[in-house]
Amino acid sequence: MKVNDRVTVKTDGGPRREGVVLEVEEFSEGVMYLVSLADYPAGVWFFNEVDSQDGTFVEPLSQ
């Protein structure tokens, strides 16, 4: 995923939320995405862990 991609994010206890990627930072353990959400337009950081389905919080929006 890259900047300006539309995505969904997993949050605590609720349904997945739609947003837009503002920034991407890669690390050896995974990738961090700054995602703009309706109630957080400046963005919230989410971390996708490498090789862990449970640690995947950001996914591309299915069209």
UniProtKB/Swiss-Prot annotation:
Transmembrane domains' residue ranges: none
Highest taxon listed in the record's lineage: Bacteria
InterPro entries tied to this protein: Dextransucrase_DSRB
Family: Belongs to the DsrB family.
HAMAP family for the chain: DsrB
Protein name: Protein DsrB
